[in-house]
């Protein structure tokens, strides 16, 4: 009896900390058919429903205004969404996991590594190490927490066809991990257009509700937007679509506590101001991507295989630089 009570207590504790399955709403008096409709529309957790605007629920066929209000009211009871003290928030922040980048210098710059529960954007020219960092993180996120990992699987959305499993095997060997296990723990998808890229996030949400993921990579988040939308005439449509995509990424980071890493390309400034700028290149996506990313890292080439990473924007990290190297076994420290 005592044992059963112990297991029940453990189960409620688990529900409290992790995302709650959408089926929980049935226990709160929501019709099973309505819960099924929510699931089909891409809502797999109570958190996803609670964070959604009412307008989004009304777009689901068969959900009336009265139903939407009832669903949101019940979801709000299960998900704490009100004010909290800064002390409590500070306590929650201390539980955030940092995933190692593979380079001690880079980890020191990021005060531990890539943060879970937020979006980290890496931008730079070609050959600056963006994709290599993504490959290394896809392996390190599987390590135990005491070794700088996130003890979870990785999800990789590739828009440019640059994903190479061989690189993961080389990094796995360096950390003494089984190559086949590492590859099994990486869910890979190739995105072919911007709508497909967004659609993949609905699938990602369903997979994250089923299994423990620590990292979601989108390499690159903006490449397809440059080809699917062209010219100034389509700029506002492009930015709206991009904003929606980034909002979904942020929601996944909030809902499942995963680290979201996106890469971005740069564009050369060709206006008059570029003559006076120290570096005439800037990340594409404008203010929309600048506001969505929590931490922005600017990567540039150094000598030989070395690369330099600069904190371009962060709410808590000071502006500084670190040097790292791209080795045969992934990202590591630069040799002096």
Curated annotation (Swiss-Prot):
It is found in: Nucleus; Cytoplasm; Chromosome. The keyword Amino-acid biosynthesis does not apply. It comes from Xenopus laevis (African clawed frog). One of its GO terms (cellular component) is cytoplasm. Belongs to the RecA family. RAD51 subfamily. The keyword GTP-binding does not apply. Residues 45-74 form the HhH domain. Its main location: nucleus. This is DNA repair protein RAD51 homolog A.
């Amino acid at each position: 009896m005592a044992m059963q009570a112990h297991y029940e207590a453990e189960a409620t504790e688990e529900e409290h900390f992790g995302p709650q399955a959408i089926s929980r709403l049935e226990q709160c008096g929501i019709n099973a058919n309505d819960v099924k409709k929510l699931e089909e529309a891409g809502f797999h957790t109570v958190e996803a429903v609670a964070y959604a605007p009412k307008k989004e629920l009304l777009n689901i066929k068969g959900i009336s205004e009265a139903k939407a209000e009832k669903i949101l009211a019940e979801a709000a009871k299960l998900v704490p969404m009100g004010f909290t003290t800064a002390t409590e928030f500070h306590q929650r922040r201390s539980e955030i996991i940092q995933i190692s980048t593979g380079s001690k210098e880079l980890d020191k710059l990021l005060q531990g590594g890539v943060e879970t529960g937020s979006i980290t954007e890496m931008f730079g020219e070609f050959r600056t190490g963006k994709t290599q960092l993504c490959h290394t993180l896809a392996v390190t996120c599987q390590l135990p927490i005491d070794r700088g990992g996130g003890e979870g699987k990785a999800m990789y959305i590739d828009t440019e066809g640059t994903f190479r499993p061989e690189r993961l095997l080389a990094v796995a060997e360096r950390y003494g991990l089984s190559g086949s296990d590492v590859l099994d723990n990486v869910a890979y998808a190739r995105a072919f257009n911007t709508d497909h890229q967004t659609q993949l996030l609905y699938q990602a949400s369903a997979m994250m509700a089923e299994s423990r993921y620590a990292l979601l990579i989108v390499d690159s988040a903006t490449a397809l937007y440059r080809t699917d939308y062209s010219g100034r005439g389509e700029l506002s449509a492009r930015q709206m679509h991009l904003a929606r995509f980034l909002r979904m990424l942020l929601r996944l980071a909030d809902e499942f506590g995963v680290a979201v890493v996106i890469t971005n390309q740069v564009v050369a400034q060709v206006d008059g101001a570029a003559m006076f700028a120290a570096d005439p290149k800037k990340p594409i996506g404008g203010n929309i991507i600048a506001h969505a990313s929590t931490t922005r890292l600017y990567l540039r080439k150094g000598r030989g295989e070395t690369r330099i990473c600069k904190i371009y924007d962060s709410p808590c990290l000071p502006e500084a630089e670190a040097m790292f190297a791209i080795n045969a076994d992934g990202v590591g420290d630069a040799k002096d």
